[in-house]
């Protein structure tokens, strides 16, 4: 990301000689202890890289024999450089291939698009590394990857196991010169064992406990220039080999970042406060060289690094960022489900694996996860903004996925036959068997349908909206089931039909087999009562109503709430399988519409929200409240933003929230801050959960996009809906269109893991799919994979070459060992790393019914990949 021009003051004249190398730990000739520095470049063709950058790096490496660089250049950049500047490209590849240069250049961030990582799915993180490393090896065949480091706060708690599985040995948690979007918590000394949620640990250079944020700055720490203050504080804290860092923006023309000067004299008055003078002597290193040759090598501390140690903030609720997050989430969900369907089609029907189209779909999804899309969405080049690119990139991913998925379902379903009936195939891309309400479009001329399962038994049905027809489907894990629909309407009975009634006091009561719920139009259509019938009739609503919209409309008199104006309520569907209630109200003169959906047997209560803004209006903290305070930003404090609030009946509640391949028990007393130097991690990736102090009951809140949540003492659980006001770099985040989003509520007993909350979120993100054919024939039901325990998730299915790779994530289950049942034959199977290295072969076993299974154990939050060699359909099918 482009820094502001005043940063150039640190860039002195080029061409001066650098400090000669000093032996590890030895004093320089003048007696000063040497410090170390990580220099290099950050950027790429999508971020910023000028035509001369490649040749510039080569020339400067030759000009300064003691200079070393660490690279964070977008891998796809090398395609363009090779095509447009072949001589420069050849010169650079020559440098990397030169044994004499092998310790002077290290590629420290090979991800495809330099994503923040904390804001995307775990599987997306895996593919960021996979595709990025693959691209770099196309250009630099002998390249190795030892250390992960980033100039931006591109960190997430689960990285240790992923990095180790890809063959990395080290990491750095510093980003001293680009902290606009945040930083990691200051902790520890020279080296720590960064310990992830699964127990994996990685040798890591942290942001030291003494590495403070730079005074009067909103983007730096005192390590960005190896300041005298930073190094002397580090030495006094017992850090024997202190190291600073700055990966310069590609395009900065100053060459080596820290310029030579006089050696520091220990004990100089004011040395611990001198943040402007670079410490001397400073020795340049790569991260690998520093850790292996300069540092203490063996960490003295173990750090159980959590997601709340990633102190980051973006303009959550800003409409442009909200749309980007939604578009990315849609594409993430689509591509994972599409790969699974394609794998089924390849194994069961012999369809070719669509590797090239899926690679292209992943490419554009990964680009849409670029950190600049999220932090500077309005920045543009040739009239095209990052936000515009996300629309284009995710659109491409979605088109490819829709085409591949449709083809796969078509191959699996079969076609042809009589036209007086239709074949309805229902596909499940998750690891659990499902019994859910699904819908399909009635054929032309049909007004109703009778649906039968593969054994000819009628199943419960219901008319949906328009030409949609609903029925209750039972589908095996990672597979599909077949149903037949005929003209007519003779539905099977429902044991406890869902329904809505309007009561004498004007409220609406919704009854399903799961819930009894009351909506009050007089209070803006909010939920007054929420009783979970199968949870000992627990009442979840507190004294105040659930689902109230509230925010500070600072141009319209301050705080407003949706309860100020009565709502119009209309019943859209009234059972027996599904009920839908439309709620239309107003907040601060802006009309909104909510669609409340409850389904028989479904734990989740779905809410779709539309806000039809007539014009841009300020929402959030008033600009006047932060004017004159450079560290303060109006978008930091979520309590002023428009939120959906859920005051529950719990006393002293606890909060849990998920992250990529992780769930965190929050230790925040509240989520509120208003200044750059006090950032908290309040990111809601997929869900946040509030439970009572005893862990007896809880309410999960799901979001259709990465955003923020609110919570605190005397402040209810809240979902950020909208912000309109000043953002980063002085940009105004405005409202330009209607706001449309989905969220869901899941009341539950026990803590999040006992309630299977991660699994519920996966079911929401990967809904059952239907494919309809007139007539036709197909196997009644198939299951490609089944796991004999709850809480294990199939993160992905891919079919590179002749092998099927099955990635499994232990989201909320026991460590095992557990049984994994493949629904296909295979030659052999092994456990492999993300890098493709065989860890060990697995021995198939048979259960008492003669079914093949594999035993697999992994810790909570562990990720494992099974590779099935030459899988094929069972011979007896």
Model-derived regions: residue spans:
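Bacterial Sec-dependent N-terminal signal peptides
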Residues: 1-28
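C-terminal (or distal) subdomains of carbohydrate-active enzymes
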Residues: 8, 159-162, 398, 406, ...
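N-terminal catalytic cores of secreted or lumenal carbohydrate-active enzymes
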Residues: 22-127, 136-139, 165-169, 310, ...
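Active-site and substrate-binding clefts of carbohydrate-active enzymes
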Residues: 29-47, 188-418, 427-429, 454, ...
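Alpha-helical scaffolding within the catalytic cores
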Residues: 52-56, 83-100, 128, 179-198, ...
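Alpha-helical scaffold elements lining the catalytic groove of polysaccharide deacetylases
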Residues: 116-138, 208-234, 579
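Catalytic domains of cell-wall/extracellular-matrix polysaccharide-remodeling enzymes
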Residues: 140-187, 252-262
């Amino acid at each position: 990301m482009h820094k502001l021009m005043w940063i150039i003051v640190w860039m002195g004249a080029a061409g001066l000689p650098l400090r000669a190398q000093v032996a590890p730990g030895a004093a320089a000739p003048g007696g000063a202890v040497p410090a170390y520095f990580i220099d290099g470049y950050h950027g790429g063709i999508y971020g910023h890289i000028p035509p001369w950058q490649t040749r510039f790096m080569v020339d400067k490496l030759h000009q300064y024999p003691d200079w070393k660089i660490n690279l964070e250049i977008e891998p796809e950049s090398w395609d363009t450089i090779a095509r447009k500047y072949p001589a420069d490209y050849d010169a650079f590849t020559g440098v990397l291939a030169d044994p004499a240069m092998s310790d002077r250049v290290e590629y420290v961030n090979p991800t495809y698009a330099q994503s923040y990582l904390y804001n995307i799915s775990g599987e997306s993180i895996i593919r960021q590394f996979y595709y990025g490393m693959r691209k770099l090896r196309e250009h630099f065949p002998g390249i190795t990857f030892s250390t992960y480091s980033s100039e931006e706060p591109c960190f997430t708690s689960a990285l240790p196991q992923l990095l180790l599985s890809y063959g990395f040995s080290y990491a750095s948690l510093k980003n001293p010169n680009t902290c606009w979007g945040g930083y990691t918590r200051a902790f520890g000394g020279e080296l720590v064992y960064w310990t992830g949620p699964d127990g994996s640990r990685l040798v890591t250079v942290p942001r030291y406990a003494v590495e403070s944020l730079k005074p009067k700055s909103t983007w730096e720490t005192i390590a960005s220039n190896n300041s005298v203050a930073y190094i002397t504080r580090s030495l006094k804290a017992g850090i024997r080999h202190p190291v600073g860092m700055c990966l310069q923006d590609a395009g900065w023309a100053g060459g080596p970042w820290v310029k030579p000067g006089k050696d520091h004299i220990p004990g100089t008055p004011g040395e611990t406060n001198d943040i402007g003078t670079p410490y001397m002597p400073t020795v340049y290193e790569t991260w690998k060289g520093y850790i292996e040759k300069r540092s203490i090598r063996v960490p003295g501390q173990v750090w159980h690094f959590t997601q709340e140690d990633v102190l980051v903030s973006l303009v959550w609720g800003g409409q442009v960022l909200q749309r980007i997050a939604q578009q990315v989430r849609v594409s993430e969900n689509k591509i994972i489900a599409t790969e699974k369907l394609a794998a089924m089609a390849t194994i069961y029907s012999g369809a070719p694996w669509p590797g090239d189209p899926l690679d292209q779909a992943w490419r554009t999804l990964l680009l849409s996860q670029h950190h600049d899309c999220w932090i500077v969405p309005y920045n543009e080049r040739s009239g095209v903004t990052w936000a515009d690119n996300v629309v284009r990139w995710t659109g491409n991913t979605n088109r490819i996925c829709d085409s591949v998925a449709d083809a796969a379902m078509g191959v699996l379903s079969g076609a042809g036959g009589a036209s007086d009936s239709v074949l309805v195939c229902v596909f499940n891309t998750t690891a659990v068997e499902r019994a859910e309400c699904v819908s399909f479009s009635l054929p032309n001329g049909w007004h109703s349908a009778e649906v039968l399962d593969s054994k000819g038994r009628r199943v419960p049905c219901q008319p949906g909206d328009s030409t949609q027809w609903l029925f209750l489907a039972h589908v095996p894990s990672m597979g599909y089931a077949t149903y037949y629909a005929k003209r007519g309407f003779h539905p099977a009975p429902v044991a406890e039909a869902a329904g809505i009634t309007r009561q004498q006091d004007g409220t609406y009561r919704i009854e399903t087999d799961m819930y009894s719920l009351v909506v009050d139009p007089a209070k803006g259509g909010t939920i007054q009562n929420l009783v979970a019938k199968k949870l000992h009739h627990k009442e979840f609503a507190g004294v105040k109503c659930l689902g109230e919209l509230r925010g500070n409309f600072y141009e319209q008199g301050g705080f407003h709430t949706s309860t100020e104006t009565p709502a119009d309520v209309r019943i859209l569907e009234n059972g027996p399988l599904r009920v839908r209630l439309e709620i239309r109200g107003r907040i601060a003169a802006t009309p909104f519409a909510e669609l409340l959906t409850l389904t028989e047997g479904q734990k989740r209560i779905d809410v779709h929200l539309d806000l039809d803004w007539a014009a841009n209006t300020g929402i959030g903290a008033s600009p006047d409240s932060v004017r004159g305070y450079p560290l303060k930003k109006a978008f930091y404090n979520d309590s002023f933003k428009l939120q959906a609030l859920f005051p529950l009946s719990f006393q002293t509640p606890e909060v849990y929230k998920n992250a990529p391949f992780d769930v965190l028990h929050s230790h925040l007393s509240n989520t509120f801050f208003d200044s750059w130097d006090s950032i908290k991690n309040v990111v809601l990736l997929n869900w946040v959960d509030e439970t009572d102090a005893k862990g007896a009951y809880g309410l999960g809140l799901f979001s259709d996009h990465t955003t923020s949540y609110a919570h605190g003492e005397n402040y209810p659980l809240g979902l950020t809906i909208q912000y309109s006001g000043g953002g980063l770099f002085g940009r105004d985040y405005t409202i330009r269109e209607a706001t449309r989003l989905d969220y869901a509520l899941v009341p539950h007993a026990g803590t999040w893991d006992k309630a299977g909350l991660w699994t519920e979120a996966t079911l929401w993100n990967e809904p059952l799919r239907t494919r309809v054919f007139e007539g036709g024939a197909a196997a009644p039901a198939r299951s490609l994979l089944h796991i004999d325990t709850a809480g294990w998730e199939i993160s992905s299915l891919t079919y590179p070459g002749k092998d099927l790779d099955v990635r499994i994530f232990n989201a909320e289950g026991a460590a095992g060992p557990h049984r994994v049942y493949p629904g296909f034959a295979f030659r052999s199977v092994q456990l492999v790393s993300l890098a493709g290295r065989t860890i060990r072969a697995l021995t198939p076993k048979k259960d008492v019914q003669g079914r093949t299974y594999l035993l697999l154990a992994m810790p909570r939050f562990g990720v494992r990949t099974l590779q099935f060699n030459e899988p094929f359909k069972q011979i007896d099918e």
